[in-house]
């Protein structure tokens, strides 16, 4: 078990003051995100896209988007739980015909509100005071752009949640004093949270330099033993972090493809071999369903659609 001289303080312990502050911060965050969430009652900005994405999932029709699908899959799951039937036409909705849009807005609003207590915990795990952590959380709560994006049918609230969750897990991981089993478990959780963020939007890949910096600085004392130990540990932790992250990314796309078996508006963007795996609604025969499990597989489809996103 390797002990880093950079970690001279014990693991951060949350106290009763932290619990009280977290409750107050969470209440304030949810009040601001939920306040008059039904206004305006018409389509705002990119709700025209993300509202329709939920419709396509409900109708199982394949669609195309430049971003990975995790945030949209989560929105679809909660839309299903609210019994939304996918009937709102977001393409032409100056006024929404039914109040179901409120349930769709509550999903990103909830995830956006959870960013505030997570930001508090991230700062505390860095070793800062209650005052510093509270200040950080209040800045997140009252940030106009975060509050606005989090109140509408957009993927940004969910992206911000997983990004801050990753930072929180990362900070706690490096607060662990010894590189033992506990550190390795949280190292895997770090990769999972990073993969979840990257599976919402590709901009989250920008978190990787932060991870790299912290791992490099944390392992620097190993140079005193030997350069081989330093580079070996850095390689092992770096490659495992990337592989866990990549696995989450692939699983997310696999779920996306499984949920969308029918041909839809995104079909023309696919290569020919993937087009043949989609089923027409009026021709759902057993032979066509059999084509769904033939080559190419989910792994090929994941990387293929990822490349097509950026053409």
Q: Model-predicted segments: where are they?
A:
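Start-transfer (signal-anchor) and selected internal transmembrane alpha helices
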Residues: 1-33, 114, 125, 235-246
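Transmembrane-lumen/periplasm boundary regions of multi-pass, lipid-linked membrane glycan transferases
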Residues: 7-10, 209-311
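Transmembrane-helix motifs of polytopic, lipid-linked glycan transferases
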Residues: 23, 102, 106-127, 165, ...
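Short helix- or helix-capping micro-motifs
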Residues: 29, 133-141, 148, 194, ...
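Short acidic/glycine- and proline-prone juxtamembrane loop motifs at membrane-interface regions
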Residues: 44-45, 145-159, 203
């Amino acid at each position: 078990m390797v002990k880093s001289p950079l970690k001279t303080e014990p693991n951060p312990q949350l106290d009763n003051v932290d619990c009280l502050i977290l409750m107050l911060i969470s209440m304030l965050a949810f009040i601001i995100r939920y306040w008059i969430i039904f206004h305006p009652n018409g389509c705002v900005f990119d709700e025209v896209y993300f509202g329709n994405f939920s419709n396509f999932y409900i109708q199982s029709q394949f669609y195309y988007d430049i971003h990975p699908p995790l945030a949209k899959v989560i929105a679809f799951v909660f839309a299903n739980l609210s019994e939304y039937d996918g009937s709102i036409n977001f393409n032409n909705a100056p006024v929404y015909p039914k109040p179901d849009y409120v349930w769709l807005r509550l999903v990103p609003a909830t995830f956006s509100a959870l960013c505030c207590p997570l930001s508090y915990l991230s700062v505390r795990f860095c070793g800062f005071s209650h005052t510093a952590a509270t200040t950080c959380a209040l800045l997140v709560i009252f940030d106009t752009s975060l509050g606005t994006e989090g109140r509408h049918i957009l993927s940004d609230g969910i992206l911000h949640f997983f990004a801050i969750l990753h930072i929180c897990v990362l900070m706690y991981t490096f607060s662990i004093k010894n590189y033992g089993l506990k550190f390795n478990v949280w190292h895997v959780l770090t990769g999972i949270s990073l993969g979840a963020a990257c599976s919402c939007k590709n901009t989250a890949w920008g978190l990787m330099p932060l991870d790299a910096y912290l791992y490099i600085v944390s392992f620097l004392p190993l140079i005193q033993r030997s350069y081989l130990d330093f580079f070996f540990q850095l390689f092992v932790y770096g490659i495992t972090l990337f592989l866990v992250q990549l696995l989450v990314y692939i699983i997310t796309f696999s779920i996306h493809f499984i949920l969308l078996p029918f041909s839809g508006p995104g079909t023309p963007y696919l290569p020919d071999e993937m087009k043949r795996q989609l089923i027409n609604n009026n021709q759902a025969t057993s032979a066509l369903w059999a084509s769904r499990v033939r080559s190419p597989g989910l792994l090929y489809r994941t990387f293929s659609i990822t490349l097509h996103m950026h053409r």
